[in-house]
């Protein structure tokens, strides 16, 4: 039996065990005492773990089991000693004198032992009461925490609703951008058709220009022909003038002959007559010549002027048309260049709008995943707190049951020691045994009360990321860690990044990426602990610093960049639930 001064209670908060109480009743008859029922209480403990350990670890569970085994042995020893006392009383019935001496020893030893048991159970009751109070405080704190988490959940729901509204607005904006894009595409098609029409017009103008150039060449050839004809006519005029001069010289020669003949004529009348006739003939010839020359000169000058005027007019008109066509061609060229530049600008704007649309879609998907992950994490935390509250309630009920059982056992021991109005206690029983030798025995049936229970553990995971790189998967046994680049076309340099893994807030394991390591878009990298995989960069890396990343009930895996900023996290927690039947 333990010393009551050095006894320490083994009751702690949130014990992870179930109590099975076996109660057996034996009747030990005593001389001249009638029927006496002695209730011996034996405690056994059963604990079936569905998965994992309690949050307090295997060490706490082992300590609780050892304490309960020690208490069970102490109670069993107490029951055995009580039985030996009764046997000794029966043996001392035949030897009254010897029994008197032994009775004094037994009374001293028995009274001391029962006093120790009483002190121990009172300490157990006090400890259990304190544990119940602490559990109640923990329950109140858990309720407050649940209220805070509910507020956070409401805030996240509001943010999610705002995100949904923003998503709807983004969809409207996307629709507007699609309408604008359609209008731009229609305008581009219209401009392409206009450019085609203008190119056809340019081709037509080029043909017309070629035709006008050919016409100009033809007119120039005609002008050359007319010039040659004019020169020919001028040559003809010169020839005619020479003929006239020749005829004039002939006429003058003939006139001189006539004058000579007239000079030979001696009569004045004949000379006057011939002279007059000659003058008249000369005058007529000169007048006729002047008329002929004037007519030819006027006709030639008028015809030349008309032809020159027609050629000049036609040339001016053709030059004006050519200049007009050139201006038109220049205008069309400038318009085509302007349309091409506008087409290039619209094409660039179209590409920019498509890029913005794609970025908005990616951002919308990332925001939606982030909000869904945050809501899932908060729901998981709420469920976990509710499960912990339920487990606390179950443990509180177990403590209350334990307290009631201990109260019942104390009442039994008090009744065994003190007795009641109808029955005698052990003290009176021993006194009567000394004075009588009659022994009556009666055996009652044994009763048993079993409390069965089962512990079930639940593991929850929580992930978060502040960029494109996230922790996709972590082995619960600590064999590997998988990272993923969620971006579709952007590479992520992970040179000198650190992957830290904290085990139950104590042990810390750090893996550092190579300085030139790059994680490609939509790719994963699997990092094995030493001895668990073969290196195959860049898809598979091996951590040579340890043969495991560690395992435990509360594990944090955190990814830091080369500046020490936290970029991604992965939380693993285990919660235990106790069920009784």
UniProtKB/Swiss-Prot annotation:
Chief place where the protein resides: cytoplasm
Tissue specificity field: Expressed in the embryonic and larval hypodermis. Also expressed in the ventral nerve cord of larvae.
Chain spans, region Linker 1: 107-120
Residue ranges of every copy of the LTD domain listed in the record: 457-574
Region described as Head: spans on this chain: 1-74
Region (Coil 1B): 121-258
Keywords in alphabetical order: Coiled coil, Cytoplasm, Intermediate filament
GO biological process, one term: nuclear migration
Region annotation Coil 2: where it falls in the sequence: 277-424
GO-annotated molecular function: structural constituent of cytoskeleton
Region (Tail): 425-578
Highest taxon in the source lineage: Eukaryota
Signal peptide (UniProt feature, chain positions): none
Region of interest (Disordered), ranges: 1-33
Cell compartments where the protein resides: Cytoplasm
InterPro entries: IF_rod_dom, Intermed_filament_ifa/ifb, Lamin_tail_dom, Lamin_tail_dom_sf
GO cellular component: cytoplasm; intermediate filament; nuclear envelope; nuclear lamina
UniProt-annotated stretches for the region Linker 12: 259-276
UniProt region (Coil 1A), positions on chain: 75-106
Record's function text: Cytoplasmic intermediate filaments provide mechanical strength to cells. Essential protein, involved in attachment structures in epidermal cells that connect muscles to the external cuticle. Required for epidermal morphogenesis in embryos. Probable component of embryonic epidermal attachment structures.
Family of this protein: Belongs to the intermediate filament family.
Subunit structure: Forms some heteromeric filaments with ifb-1.
Protein name listed in UniProt: Intermediate filament protein ifa-3
Organism in which the protein naturally occurs: Caenorhabditis elegans
UniProt lineage: Eukaryota, Metazoa, Ecdysozoa, Nematoda, Chromadorea
